A protein has these predicted regions:
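Exposed beta-strand/loop interface patches that mediate assembly or binding
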Residues: 1-61
Length: 61
């Protein structure tokens, strides 16, 4: 399991599911936001296998 830290840059929907673009390092990845209660732009999140698992307050190193 690889956990990465990112910042939500865009929120949308795809096929009835909540998705978003998350800035991870220098890359932008499209991920599922379905597990987050109320995602907003700029939220810091932990991502695993294309799914945002939780919001975080500080980067996890």
């Amino acid at each position: 399991m690889n956990l990465v830290y990112g910042v939500i840059a865009e929120i949308g929907s795809e096929q009835g599911r909540r998705t978003g673009k998350v800035r991870v390092g220098g890359a932008i990845k499209r991920i599922s936001l379905d597990l987050l209660a109320d995602p907003t732009l700029g939220d810091k999140v932990l991502v695993c296998e294309g799914v945002a698992l939780a919001k975080v307050e500080d980067p996890v190193m």
